[in-house]
């Protein structure tokens, strides 16, 4: 019996049980789950997730990218991978979770990827019990310091649930008004979903990508933070800003990371600084 089959046969049916399970896992296993979400597509979310994984792995952390963009997954494409199995196979009980995970090397950094699958509307049939069970299985593997969940753009139920169940939400946006409006909705629903799960705190951090200058990025953050304070009663943390860099598209076309192709570029420096500020504990997954 696969590890996913074992937990899918015991779905979580109540909010109180979800809370109990998450709290017990948090105390026993030290893996940091970081959800990377955005309100709209095209803001660089997946590129950022891969770059962040590469930087954290270079720091010595054991990292897994979970491609949670059900239906439009493309982490494997950006990395040039050709996975034999993926998340849909795990959800369909055709393969064990560990057998679907694939190793990846970018430059001198090594990390793992749990690939998704494009063109399959799998999210419609996934309930919270299956999602919680999947996170449980990943935590119980106890081999990762960080799991980065590259989520679907928007506010579908699966994306919202995975965001709320994570330890940190990195909400990615650009300076464009439409992107800011949409990421505000993501943060608003994230806070609401955390309350629904019985959590008393939120750890929402904003990533502003493709900024013209650090000054314009700071002004964008200040306006959005003020809106959150006025209407939500809390303000997000500024995780960091990434300057617009023409070398990013070139790295994506090469199916590589800009931290490998041009490590001294504006975007590389900004991603590295942002990753360093996350303060991920060393060997967190072995600290229990």
Positions of PLM-derived features:
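P-loop/Walker-type NTP enzyme "switch/lid" segment
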Residues: 65-145, 252-253
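Beta-strand-loop-alpha "switch" segments that mediate conformational coupling across diverse proteins
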Residues: 229-258, 271
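Conserved catalytic-core segment of NTP-binding enzymes
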Residues: 151-240
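Extreme N-terminal, non-catalytic leader segments
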Residues: 1-42, 54-55, 61, 99
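Conserved nucleotide-binding/hydrolysis micro-motifs of P-loop NTPases
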Residues: 70-72, 118-121, 154, 176-178, ...
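NTP-binding/hydrolysis catalytic cores, primarily Walker-type P-loop NTPases
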Residues: 253-288
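Hydrophobic positions on the alpha1 helix immediately C-terminal to the Walker A/P-loop
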Residues: 48
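Conserved lysine of the Walker
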Residues: 45
């Amino acid at each position: 019996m696969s590890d996913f089959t074992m937990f899918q046969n015991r779905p979580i049916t109540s909010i109180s049980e979800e809370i109990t399970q998450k709290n017990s896992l948090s105390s026993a296993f030290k893996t940091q789950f970081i959800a990377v979400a955005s309100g709209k597509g095209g803001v660089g979310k997946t590129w950022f997730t891969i770059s962040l994984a590469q930087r954290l792995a270079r720091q010595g952390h054991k990292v897994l990218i979970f491609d949670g963009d059900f239906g439009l997954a493309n982490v494997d494409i950006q990395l040039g991978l050709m996975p034999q199995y993926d998340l849909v196979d795990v959800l369909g009980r055709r393969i064990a979770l560990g057998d679907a995970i694939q190793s990846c090397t970018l430059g001198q950094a090594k990390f793992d990827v749990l690939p998704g699958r494009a063109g399959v509307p799998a999210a419609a049939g996934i309930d919270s019990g299956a999602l919680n069970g999947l996170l449980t299985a990943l935590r119980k593997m106890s081999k990762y310091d960080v799991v980065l969940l590259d989520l679907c753009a928007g506010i579908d139920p699966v994306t919202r649930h995975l965001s709320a169940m994570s330890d940190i939400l990195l909400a990615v946006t650009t300076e464009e008004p439409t992107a800011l409006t949409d990421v505000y909705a993501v943060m608003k629903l994230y806070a609401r979903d955390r309350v629904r799960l019985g959590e008393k705190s939120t750890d929402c951090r904003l990533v502003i990508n493709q900024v013209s200058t650090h000054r314009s990025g700071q002004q964008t953050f200040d306006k959005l933070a003020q809106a959150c304070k006025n209407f939500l009663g809390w303000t997000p943390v500024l995780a960091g800003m990434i300057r617009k860099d023409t070398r990013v598209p070139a790295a994506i076309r090469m199916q590589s990371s800009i931290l490998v192709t041009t490590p001294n570029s504006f975007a590389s420096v900004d991603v590295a600084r942002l990753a360093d500020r996350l303060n991920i504990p060393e060997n967190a997954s072995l600290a229990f």
